[in-house]
């Protein structure tokens, strides 16, 4: 019987047996007066205010850089503009920014932190930890955690933890979208802020359990398991709380790095189904307690607005196009484990560094994957994608024998917020298929170098095998043809590092205009091996016609794995420097730490004003 286990307070009142007594009612009223149940909803507002402040500060930073970039004299009409920031304010700003970047650009060991789902960027880590600390303090510092008896009201710890969890839901859903209002405000694309979506979800899950446990603990403390069973049967709130926390736990488990790594496509389909179940069950559970359902109303309004905007502007409902209009992509194998997709004509505007989501119209239509895009040299007006065969979608595409595929395009997304034209030096650092991100910057800004502040564009590309260079053969030939003088003047520098020592016929260090494939290819391979890369080879070769000699020395191929830290430190840093990197985790780790170290030059060298880093990753 429950009465056999009945908590007795110091004043002699029983928490269960005396529940209908006048003294019990008076003590309940005193407990509510001391810690009002209705006040607990303020803790949800405290969380919202904190996140709003972070977003506001990020917005200020974005607007400041937009103003700063627009005031630069990289266009004739901007010269001698009265809107140029004062020298004093500019110096203060550059020093503060450099100090911030000195800390925030640094990277933690990628393998360990990524495996644990912890942000690898120091800057992101600090924001996440600040938010975590703030919410933990607001949840656990206020007392009391419990009321003397459960009948006096819900445990204050449970109520405030629950309302804090609900207040995070709008941010969780908003940050999940490929188009989201928070990303637009802070100037980050969705793949950059996806880590905040993950950690907002983790905090939401944590506070959900903090909400649940005090109810269970107090019921057991007062009347044992029988009391818990009675509360379960009598309270609809208890029963309705199970589905949302179950959905939330399944969302967390399926989102763990190890689960995403091995079951990515299952995760993609399961994620939105569980999210819908979580939202509906949570709405039923909280309505209308403390008006907390209004957080969920805001969630659905923002989420649907983002979804509609994405479909209408980026996706399959674009005005002037038929619903889910498909396009044809040419498919070809361009090396071991690499597929080339070319769409000859695209009806969308895009910027360097952006990517699209591709969905093939076949049995794999439910799968869509992101790929960086760049202009195709072979088909002007077309776009090209390089896809490394790994698992799922990319592996099926690589193993298919199709020369053409019907695809659906969603995008473009991502890109860089800063105006590249305002920098003096641009350094493009990439490995493998990361060239898809970096090359379009050279393609776009190389031809207009003389119209901007840009003085030098440097591309350093690390590949495993020499044959990988053929991925962008046409594009590099076009660039070396059209921008030959810039190459010769050292205003465009291209270095390709080949980690292995394999040699494939038809790939040469200087990207000749024409190649006679009927020639003795083994002789060519031997000559390449014997040649000192980066130097002019004056020996004639029957493989190439006379025009080939024009391209000697324009592009340097180095047959070794580079020390990227040394490569970056050897750069002739200019006045305003932009570093763009894309590739492996180890590359981004090295580049991040190296560019963080370069911030010291902003303090020590008056001829260096800025070292900005933009990195791309497909870890989302």
UniProtKB/Swiss-Prot annotation:
Residues 519-543 are annotated as: Disordered. Pfam families: FAD_binding_8, Ferric_reduct, NAD_binding_6. It is a multi-pass membrane protein. It catalyses: 2 a Fe(II)-siderophore + NADP(+) + H(+) = 2 a Fe(III)-siderophore + NADPH. The chain crosses the membrane at residues 46-66, 108-128, 168-188, 195-215, 238-258, 266-286, 293-313. Residues 161-320 form the Ferric oxidoreductase domain. Its cofactor is FAD. Keywords: Cell membrane, Copper, Copper transport, Electron transport, FAD, Flavoprotein, Heme, Ion transport, Iron, Iron transport, Membrane, Metal-binding, NADP, Oxidoreductase, Transmembrane, Transmembrane helix, Transport. Residues 523-532 have a biased composition (Basic and acidic residues). InterPro entries: FAD-bd_8, FAD-bd_FR_type, Fe3_Rdtase_TM_dom, Fe_red_NAD-bd_6, Ferric/Cupric_Reductase, FNR_nucleotide-bd, Riboflavin_synthase-like_b-brl. Its main location: membrane. Residues 67-107, 189-194, 259-265, 314-620 are cytoplasmic. Heme 1 binds at residues 197, 271. Residues 321-419 form the FAD-binding FR-type domain. Belongs to the ferric reductase (FRE) family. PANTHER family: FERRIC-CHELATE REDUCTASE (PTHR32361:SF23), FERRIC/CUPRIC REDUCTASE TRANSMEMBRANE COMPONENT (PTHR32361). This is Ferric/cupric reductase transmembrane component 7. It comes from Saccharomyces cerevisiae (strain ATCC 204508 / S288c).
